[in-house]
Structure formats: structure tokens, C-alpha cells
Amino acid sequence: MAQETGSVLEDLRSRLSGDTVNDIGRRIGADPAQTKQAIDAALPMLLAALGQEAADPQRSAGLKQAIREDHDGSVVDNLGEYLSGQMSGRATNGEGIVNHVLGDRREPAVQALSSKSGLDFGAIASLLPLLAPIVMGMLGKKERSGGLSLDSITDALGQDTRRAADEQPDLGDLLGSVLGGSGSGEGGIGDMLGSIFGRR
């Protein structure tokens, strides 16, 4: 099993490259270049939404419990098997994860990611549930290996989201429009994430 030594986002990007992008593209009916662009925007969206949940005192305990009990990293370590539909169980319930984390923001998230990547609504709607178990699996894998403390998960996810927004100048607006906050306009990405993660 590969050892993850970077940030959550860095390690996800490392895993979601090359042939894996091609496999995901085939699943959602998109070419590799557009699939990669969509993944690069969708990962920060999911991480920011999870960070928002982790910052909510009423929801953080449930998120941490799910990571500890349902996501041991097996999805990450067996991506080929997972993407070919050979795995089952709570760890692979992408629809459930996306519905729980995004709730009524799911459709706006799909619309925003579709506009950014150029993929149609249906492709993005299929992509998010494919990625969600991989993201949760990475959190569980890093927690078990000592590379992530769930007590500081909000900070870790916030740092990753800021890094992604710095790399993609329009991503702050996309996240802000879907998850709340000021985007990259007045106040900038820091204020947007402060709103998302409950910091004033």
C-alpha cells in the first residue's frame, strides 16, 4: 500500500491521475482532459463542504465517526476495483455521502462544476458520487497512518481549499456561490472560507 505523505488534496491528486482519470472518464462519458479539469474543481468543492461540516459542532462528531468506522482507505488502495464496481458497502456509498455533505446545495454544485469544466450536468452528477468515497477513504487512510488528526481536520481541509483557490483564481467564486461566503471578491478567499468554516 502506498504511503500518503502530502496534504489531503496533494495525495488525492497523486492518486487521481493517469489511467485512473481515464477510467473515471469512461464511467462518466467524458474525455480525459475534461475529466481532469472537472476533478481538479470537484475535489476542493468536496473538501470545502467536508470542512464546513467538520466546523459545525452539531455535525462534526458524525463526520469523524463515519471516517473512523466506515472509511479505512481500502477504496483508495483499490481504485481499479472500486471504479469497476467490484466493491460495495458503506465506504462506497457515494450518493449517500454527497447527499449528506451537500444536501440541497448538490444541484447548484453540479451546475457550477459543469460550467467550469465544460462537462454536461449528467457527467458531473455522476462524477461527484464517484469521487466522494475516494475523498472519504483518503481521510480515513491518513487518519489511520497518523498523517491526519481528526481533531484538526477543519484546519487541514481549509488549508487545502485555500491552496486550490490560489491555483485556480475563479475557484473561490465557484465555492462561494455554492457553499456561501464572499468568493474571491471583496474580502477574498480567506473571508469566504472563514464564512464556510465558521470563522469570523
Q: Where is each model-derived feature located?
A:
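A structural "flexibility-hinge" signal
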Residues: 1-200
